């Protein structure tokens, strides 16, 4: 009898200790989360019922909220840099030395609001040389604003398909930089991030022509132990992986496929939905695979790259091979972005050692 009571006593003590331990751990995690957000965010109300939140940004901290909103209210169509995802992006000039890219998101549904907050959670602590920095945001009952650093050379899309020719060295460097940015989102962010809309217009170019991955309006957070998510279908025709149309599920391997299309775009100088392809009822990927099947790979390379050195031609062939790996119909066969980065970086090392 005494042994039974003693056993019950020890069991009770163990259960109580276990519960208290869980509570203590939960409190520690909460304090850590609160301290982290207190350090990185500085929110204050703005006239009109809105609230501005600034992440650690010396550039944004030097601008008063009243000045920022005053400038924002003067934005017009002439300030538009582009549209896509959930909203429109404007160039916001504060003074001669301070300029931002501001993305305006029209609020209207709870689903869109959830997407907005999910985006902020994903972007708040992301700091990488190949990802566009989010300086802060403004939220109000009528609309939301995301405040980014401005990329002076615009998007890869506008640069690649514009009047200025982009040499191979620049294209290769952009490919490597974009791959590093996407790899960081996939494998180094916690939770991991699936971009869902990798395309040339979402790869921006800084003052050094370095690639910066942008537009997380369509980004989806993924817990580390998940292999896919199923929310709304998003993406851009010509870049979407074939399985996306069957399942509606966004995956990392879907992003890899989209990046493969970007590599083809860099090699061919052609848009995935070029008018010529549209007239023939096809797209860039289908055309390239047909050319490979006919063993006419030489027609793939952009005419503006003709006359490149022997070393550069070898690099183009190697990048073409990596693009085809990314475009494998079976997702499981495609390489992870970490592997894509290694393959792209190895090209320079191998070609240098050969010459």
From Swiss-Prot:
Topological domains, Cytoplasmic: 30-355
Ranges facing Extracellular side: 1-8
Swiss-Prot/TrEMBL catalytic activity: L-seryl-[protein] + ATP = O-phospho-L-seryl-[protein] + ADP + H(+); L-threonyl-[protein] + ATP = O-phospho-L-threonyl-[protein] + ADP + H(+)
InterPro entries, sorted: Kinase-like_dom_sf, Prot_kinase_dom, Protein_kinase_ATP_BS, Ser/Thr_kinase_AS
Protein topology in the membrane: Single-pass membrane protein
Modified residues (Phosphoserine): 201, 230
SUPFAM superfamilies for the chain: Protein kinase-like (PK-like) (SSF56112)
Domain spans labelled Protein kinase: 75-347
Transmembrane feature ranges: 9-29
Keywords: ATP-binding, Cell membrane, Kinase, Membrane, Nucleotide-binding, Phosphoprotein, Receptor, Serine/threonine-protein kinase, Transferase, Transmembrane, Transmembrane helix
Positions of modified residues (Phosphotyrosine): 148, 244
GO molecular function (one): protein serine kinase activity
One Pfam family in the UniProt entry: Pkinase
Modified residues (Phosphothreonine): 231, 236
Binding positions (ATP): 81-89, 103
Annotated EC: 2.7.11.1
Catalytic residues (UniProt): 197 (proton acceptor)
The organism's place on the tree of life at top rank: Eukaryota
Localization annotation: Cell membrane
Cellular component GO terms, alphabetical: plasma membrane
Entry similarity comment: Belongs to the protein kinase superfamily. Ser/Thr protein kinase family.
UniProt name for this protein: Receptor-like serine/threonine-protein kinase At1g78530
Protein species of origin: Arabidopsis thaliana (Mouse-ear cress)
